């Protein structure tokens, strides 16, 4: 005779600033979201798959929109293993991790235990010496170890949510919100050296070419760290407002494990369908795809696209996580797989003008306009890449590090040079 075991239910209250959205439940690994009546009448849907008019959304055995949505707030891969081990929680227990790290998760939502209240906003100074010690403790301990606020940020890399105010780093406490994301160099320095300056260079290059990107900078503590201003925050210091944003997986109701597998022109069109300005957004997505091709970014997946909610609907957020992965695969980087195929091309070296035109057409951009955008971006990118490299080498932007300078030259005269040549062909023959 089977013995029935009653599984305890767990609950978290979901907040956006001072507004209560509802309750998140989990029992027997099945999740449910119950909207607060006030939010149901006056708020907005957390995502297209979580409509307010349903009142309560319950996951099933195979379709789990609630779990997929909230799981996307947590770190991935090794980052999740590390914060879970540091907290003494099983990495497979996503709800338990949200209970622990919900007060400062990725995005704008705050997840609190029933009745829990956060202390008033406060900032604690984060000295360069303390930050350096935390970096040196990687990967044994996460960067958030010792932080006054339990924090969890989505993604696979080590990162820390901080406040940058007049050149000083601070850590948020209580109701205080972070303004910047901080990343050190990749822990596997032999395989991925100088990732900080790599991302800084590619983000600055994107901005110089007219792509929307947030402010970025490099700080040395003395280890280099990359700082990027959060596009989902407004204000400074203790007066920061959270803006609601979703990444591509959340907007499409996909588990994070599908961020590569489901990347296609079809999913881009599905994202376009929910934006308030699809014509503007499809051109922005075309430029984003072309830029990632030119720098050799083989990690431009669905979670690296985000959308901000406004009064009139969803709009594409500024770009982030732009870096050259190809520079670490030289000299045969052309065999790297494109995350979003272009036409029939699935590898970087297979891309031609014809394939780029086909990709543009597949997301609704006419071939002629696609090729005009290609020509403009190619011209701007080559000019700006050389100018930014020269500025770095002359010490205008940073104190020159020989290893960093060598990597930046490899990006410009490796992947960028190769990709520009491939994109100038009409065919592979």
Report each predicted region and the residues it spans:
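Phosphate/dinucleotide-binding and metal-coordinating scaffold of catalytic cores
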Residues: 1-429
């Amino acid at each position: 005779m089977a013995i029935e075991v009653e599984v305890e239910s767990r609950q978290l209250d979901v907040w956006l600033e001072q507004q209560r959205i509802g309750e998140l439940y989990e029992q027997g690994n099945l999740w449910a979201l119950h909207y607060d009546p006030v939010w149901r009448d006056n708020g907005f849907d957390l995502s297209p798959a979580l409509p307010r008019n349903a009142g309560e959304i319950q996951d099933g055995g195979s379709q789990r929109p609630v779990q997929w949505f909230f799981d996307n707030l947590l770190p991935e891969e090794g980052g999740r293993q590390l914060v879970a081990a540091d907290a003494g929680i099983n990495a497979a227990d996503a709800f338990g991790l949200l209970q622990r790290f919900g007060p400062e998760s990725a995005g704008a939502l705050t997840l609190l235990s029933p009745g829990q209240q956060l202390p008033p906003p406060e900032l604690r100074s984060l000295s360069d010496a303390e930050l350096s010690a935390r970096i040196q403790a990687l990967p044994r301990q996460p960067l958030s170890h010792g932080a006054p606020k339990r924090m969890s940020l989505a993604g696979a890399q080590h990162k820390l949510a901080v406040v940058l105010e007049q050149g000083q780093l601070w850590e948020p406490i209580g109701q205080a919100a972070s303004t910047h994301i901080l990343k050190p160099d990749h822990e596997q320095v032999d395989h991925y050296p100088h990732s900080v300056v790599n991302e800084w260079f590619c983000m600055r290059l994107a901005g110089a070419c007219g792509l929307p990107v947030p402010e970025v900078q490099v700080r040395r503590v003395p280890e280099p760290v990359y700082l990027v201003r959060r596009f989902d925050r407004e204000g400074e210091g203790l007066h920061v407002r959270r803006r609601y944003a979703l990444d591509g997986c959340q907007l499409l109701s996909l588990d994070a494990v599908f961020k590569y597998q489901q990347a296609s022109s079809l999913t881009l069109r599905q994202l376009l369908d929910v934006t308030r300005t699809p014509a503007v957004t499809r051109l922005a997505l075309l430029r984003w795809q072309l830029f990632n091709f030119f720098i050799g970014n083989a990690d431009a997946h669905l979670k690296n696209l985000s959308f901000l909610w406004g009064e009139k609907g969803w709009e594409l957020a500024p770009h982030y996580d732009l870096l050259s992965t190809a520079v670490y695969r030289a000299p045969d980087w052309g065999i790297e797989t494109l995350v979003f195929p272009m036409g029939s091309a699935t590898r970087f070296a297979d891309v031609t003008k014809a394939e780029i035109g086909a990709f543009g057409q597949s997301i609704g951009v006419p071939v002629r306009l696609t090729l005009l955008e290609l020509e403009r971006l190619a011209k701007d990118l080559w000019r700006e890449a050389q100018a930014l490299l020269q500025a770095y080498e002359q010490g205008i932007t940073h104190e020159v590090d020989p290893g960093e300078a060598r990597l930046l030259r490899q990006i410009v005269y490796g992947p960028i040079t190769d990709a520009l040549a491939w994109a100038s062909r009409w065919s592979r023959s």
